[in-house]
From Swiss-Prot:
GO CC, alphabetical: ribonucleoprotein complex; ribosome
Family: Belongs to the universal ribosomal protein uS11 family.
Function (record text): Located on the platform of the 30S subunit, it bridges several disparate RNA helices of the 16S rRNA. Forms part of the Shine-Dalgarno cleft in the 70S ribosome.
Presence of keyword Phosphoprotein: no
Key words, A-Z: Ribonucleoprotein, Ribosomal protein, RNA-binding, rRNA-binding
Protein name: Small ribosomal subunit protein uS11
UniProt xrefs under SUPFAM superfamilies: Translational machinery components
Length: 129
C-alpha cells in the first residue's frame, strides 16, 4: 500500500483565433458550447452549472451569466472571432448572443439551426393552467 499520489489535471492552453458558439436554448435550460472549426469543444457552460436551479435556469439572465462564463474560458485559449449557431425555442437565445458580443468577441455570422420536424414525432400535450 504505497502513498497515493494526486495528479493535477492541467488544461492545456490552445491558441485558436476563431471558433463556433453553439447556443442551445430549451424551455428549461440554456447551454453554450464553444468549439473550433472542426467541432472539438473548447469551453462550455450552462445555466444549471452557474448555480441556477428550477425555473430560474430558463431565464434570460441565467443565459447571460452562462455566456459570460464561457466567453471568459474561451478567451483564455486566445479566441477572438465567433460564428454563432442558435438552436431551440427558449428565452435565453438573444441574451446569450448579446453577452457574447459584449464580452469582446467579433461575431462574424449568426445562424438559426433550430430543427423543424416535417411532421415527425407527436408533440407533447397542451398545458391547461
Amino acid at each position: 500500500m504505497g502513498k497515493e499520489t494526486t495528479r493535477i489535471r492541467r488544461r492545456e492552453r490552445k491558441n485558436i483565433a476563431s471558433g463556433i458558439a453553439h447556443v442551445n436554448s430549451s424551455f428549461n435550460n440554456t447551454t453554450i458550447t464553444i468549439t473550433d472549426a472542426q467541432g472539438n469543444a473548447i469551453a462550455w457552460s450552462s445555466a444549471g452549472t452557474m448555480g441556477f436551479k428550477g425555473s430560474r435556469k430558463s431565464t434570460p439572465y441565467a443565459a447571460q451569466v452562462a455566456a459570460e462564463d464561457v466567453a471568459k474560458k474561451a478567451q483564455e485559449h486566445g479566441m477572438r472571432t465567433l460564428e454563432v449557431e442558435v438552436a431551440g425555442p427558449g428565452s435565453g437565445r438573444e441574451s446569450a448572443l448579446r453577452a457574447l458580443q459584449a464580452a469582446g468577441f467579433t461575431v462574424t455570422s449568426i445562424r438559426d439551426v433550430t430543427t423543424i420536424p416535417h411532421n415527425g414525432c407527436r408533440p407533447r400535450k397542451r398545458r391547461r393552467v
